[in-house]
Amino acid sequence: MKEEQFFFNDTNYSIKIGKNKTENDHLVKTSAKTDIWFHVNNTSSSHVVLLNNEKLNKIPKQVIKRCACLCKSNSSSKSELKCEIIYTEMANVSATEHEGQVTVNGLSKIIVI
């Protein structure tokens, strides 16, 4: 699993990136309900998790965009001109019986160009 630190406006953000279904599954099962989960919409991709204890609407848009870009760059969609990334609080993400697969409610969306 890859981890990255991101500084924005004097705040340090921690980001985790699952590189395969086992790591993705581990992220889903161990992340806090307030962490923010990112995934390429309607295709397989890495799971990106922003460690967080704030409300989603309090996170700067630049931080959300950074996580979405990491999600795109770690997916099979990395060479596409436009890529739709879904993101939501981990409280809305549930593991299924299939390793690395999830069900999601309460989506927000961002288009990465």
Residue ranges, per PLM feature:
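Duplex nucleic acid-engaging cores and interfaces of nucleic-acid transaction enzymes
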Residues: 1-113
